[in-house]
């Protein structure tokens, strides 16, 4: 007599083993992905600029450049006095903000603050491909170089009034130049900073004119 013997066949669900995905050699890492996302707007087209906004912006730039060259600290100009005080707000904010990271950044924190805010504004307009906004933000950013240059040049003569009537011990750039042992090169450093500011301002205006011509031709 024979017996029917059933052959054992393992279920497929036990045979199938999930394997971890093998990373591709050409797959970008996290930093590369973040960088690609950050610079992605560079491939987008700029918004066109018509002649009226370009003309109005150019007139404003010309007036501001004249005032920057003749009355930077706003002794005779309400507009420049207002602009200087706006910059001063971000300057004073920068001190406690960067002091969180230690005294090394706390001293130049004022200057970093008044440069960082316009830079953030400029980058925001750049990401939106806003031509006029980017130009205005860039102008503001480089205008702060002129403001900083005045503060630098005062490191030796100590003629500028400081907030709260404080003395030379509270002068950011005198302290920094003393720490770096470059107080004797104050004029050179301040002059270079001022030159960079003017070069940046003229470059921004020239770029805006170029973008207007591109919009006009298209």
Model-derived regions: residue spans:
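Context-gated lysine
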Residues: 6-7, 12, 30, 47, ...
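Active-site recognition of the HExxH zinc-binding catalytic motif
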Residues: 84-99, 110
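Metalloprotease/metallohydrolase-associated module, dominated by Zn2+-dependent proteases
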Residues: 37-75, 104-218
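Low-complexity, intrinsically disordered extramembrane tails and loops of integral membrane proteins
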Residues: 1-43, 218
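Interfacial/capping segments of alpha-helical transmembrane domains
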Residues: 70-86
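Generic hydrophobic alpha-helical membrane-segment signal
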Residues: 79, 83, 98, 132-135
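Low-complexity, intrinsically disordered, cysteine-poor segments enriched in small/polar
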Residues: 30-37, 85, 89-92, 179
């Amino acid at each position: 007599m024979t017996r029917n013997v059933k052959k054992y066949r393992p279920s497929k669900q036990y045979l199938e083993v999930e394997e971890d995905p093998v990373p591709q050699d050409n797959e970008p890492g996290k930093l590369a992905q973040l960088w690609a996302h950050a610079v992605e707007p560079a491939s987008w087209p700029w918004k066109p600029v018509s002649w009226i906004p370009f003309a109005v912006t150019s007139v404003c730039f010309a007036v501001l450049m004249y005032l920057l060259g003749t009355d930077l600290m706003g002794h005779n100009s309400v507009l420049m006095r207002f602009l200087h005080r706006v910059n001063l707000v971000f300057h004073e904010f920068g001190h406690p903000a960067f002091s969180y990271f230690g005294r090394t950044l706390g001293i130049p924190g004022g200057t970093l603050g008044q440069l960082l805010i316009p830079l953030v504004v400029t980058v925001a307009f750049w990401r939106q491909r806003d031509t006029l906004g980017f130009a205005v933000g860039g102008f503001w950013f480089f205008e702060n170089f002129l403001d900083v240059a005045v503060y630098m040049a005062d490191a030796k003569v100590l003629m500028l009034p400081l907030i709260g009537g404080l003395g030379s011990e509270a002068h950011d750039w005198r302290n920094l130049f003393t720490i770096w042992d470059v107080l004797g090169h104050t004029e050179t450093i301040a002059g270079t900073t001022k030159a960079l500011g003017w070069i940046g301002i003229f470059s921004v205006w020239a770029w805006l004119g170029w973008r207007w011509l591109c919009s006009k031709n298209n």
